[in-house]
Amino acid sequence: CPFDAMGSTMATYGGQNVGAGKLDRLGKGLKSCVLLGVGYSVIAFLIAVFFGGPLAQLFVDGGEAEIIANVCAFLLWNTAFYIPLALVNIVRFLIQGMGFPKFAILAGVFEMIARSLAGFGLVPIIGFTGVCLGSPIAWIMADAFLIPAYFHVSKVLQKRMVPQTDVPQAV
């Protein structure tokens, strides 16, 4: 998946730039990768809109109208939220590469909570649409944690890079 590749790229990019002390490059790389993710997301959504049915029929007999309709609905709901998915992968792995792996793990916990809430809360009320919304809700919940976390770890790293001038020197 392109989002996995973007995430792996950002982990390496984050680690290299933090190691080199070039924190100013992190935001530029993040912006560039997010733009790539948005571009891919739009293309994937358009493919799902215009070719979801034929794609489903590659795997399901054309006579299975209800299954094909469910596949199309699932594709549309998920691809409509690929931008938040792109952000999850890009920001999570960037933070991990910057040296803060616990934040990446916590984002996964938020995703798990969101999927559980969708499964137990939405599916009984709205049925299959609740299933379709499980992952998008998880991605949004992870982003709600990861985006502020990125700014937090950036500030932490900025403070680490600033030389301590108010510390008395030993003579």
What are the functions of these language-model segments?
Residues 1-52, 85-99, 103-107:
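Small-residue-rich hydrophobic transmembrane alpha-helices
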Residues 14, 55-56, 95, 122, ...:
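Hydrophobic alpha-helical interface/terminus motif in multipass membrane transporters
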Residues 37, 75-78, 82, 108, ...:
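Residue-level recognition of transmembrane alpha-helices
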Residues 51-78:
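Interfacial segments at transmembrane-helix termini and the short loops linking adjacent helices
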Residues 53-54, 112-144, 148:
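Membrane-interface helix-loop junctions in multi-pass transport and translocation proteins
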Residues 54-63, 126, 130, 153-162:
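Membrane-interfacial segments
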Residues 77-91, 141-153:
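Hydrophobic alpha-helical segments of multi-pass membrane transport proteins
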Residues 136-171:
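C-terminal transmembrane helix end/exit motif
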